[in-house]
Amino acid sequence: MEQLRGLYPPLAAYDSGWLDTGDGHRIYWELSGNPNGKPAVFIHGGPGGGISPHHRQLFDPERYKVLLFDQRGCGRSRPHASLDNNTTWHLVADIERLREMAGVEQWLVFGGSWGSTLALAYAQTHPERVSEMVLRGIFTLRKQRLHWYYQDGASRFFPEKWERVLSILSDDERKDVIAAYRQRLTSADPQVQLEAAKLWSVWEGETVTLLPSRESASFGEDDFALAFARIENHYFTHLGFLESDDQLLRNVPLIRHIPAVIVHGRYDMACQVQNAWDLAKAWPEAELHIVEGAGHSYDEPGILHQLMIATDRFAGK
């Protein structure tokens, strides 16, 4: 039986800083690995999730030069939890600014969950800048998928956890959970915001792995939850600021020439495996791996194994 791959050993960033976007945001970025290695950009999830030192370990440090960054309003980027000038297209422009700052012509784009959404939006806008793509836990931000996770679908698998999400809502508000939480997450009362943020964030933290994870507790930490919930709800309220429900699938022909690996857990409750299947049907050149016995998170054993194989293989080019 094949031994499952794990992360590369921990490593420090060799450079870091903040990029001033010119419209009120400062984006935290860092570079790790080999300064002369193959360029890659890591796009985190959420939106609002931020980067972790573990994310550096997805890439061979001897063969990759990896740029990681906290998207607007989250992680170490400032202002914290800000929704102003914070849309998908602002983030696409930020990635281009970071590419130019790093002196990179083309790079591998790695994104999971919301990171796969943003990776697709970026690649479809700037296909000439993308050498390869590694996508995990596919999320194309269609209304039906939001309804599954925030209204009626995943709730049937986690009824006791969903009950906590509904606990602060009236019967009438429960008809549109995203809208009801929008009211609270943009309230003038910081305590109302924080209460809603923690419930929203913990719901995701407790449902993204097939088996319970100790790391889900971090989703309830005040600073993380506030940015995560406010930004995520903001994007979902506006349907990702996309032109249409099928924009990312419709525009796949723009990127079909880019080598790509798609990895998705069979029992992903946050982003159904149908998302990956639909993307792969639109993109037959892409390599699809549906991982049995796995949920949504990148660090579940079978998912991580496929991601590591993909980054190693692309580094060999």
From Swiss-Prot:
Query: In the UniProt entry, which residues are flagged as the active site?
Result: 113, 268, 296
Task: Classify the main location.
Answer: cytoplasm
Q: Name one Pfam family in it.
A: Abhydrolase_1
Description of how the protein assembles with itself and partners: Monomer.
| Similarity section | Belongs to the peptidase S33 family.
Cite the entry's keywords alphabetically: Aminopeptidase, Cytoplasm, Hydrolase, Protease
* Top EC class of this enzyme: hydrolase
Identify the residues that the record assigns to the AB hydrolase-1 domain, covering every copy: 41-296
Question: What does this protein do, in the record's words?
Answer: Specifically catalyzes the removal of N-terminal proline residues from peptides.
Give me any GO biological process, just one.
proteolysis
Q: Give the source lineage, highest ranks first.
A: Bacteria, Pseudomonadati, Pseudomonadota, Gammaproteobacteria, Enterobacterales
Q: Name one GO molecular function term.
A: aminopeptidase activity
Which locations, inside or outside the cell, does it occupy? Answer: Cytoplasm
Question: Where does this protein come from, organism-wise?
Answer: Serratia marcescens
Please report the name of this protein according to its UniProt entry: Proline iminopeptidase
What the entry lists under InterPro entries is as follows:
AB_hydrolase_1, AB_hydrolase_fold, Peptidase_S33, Pro_iminopeptidase
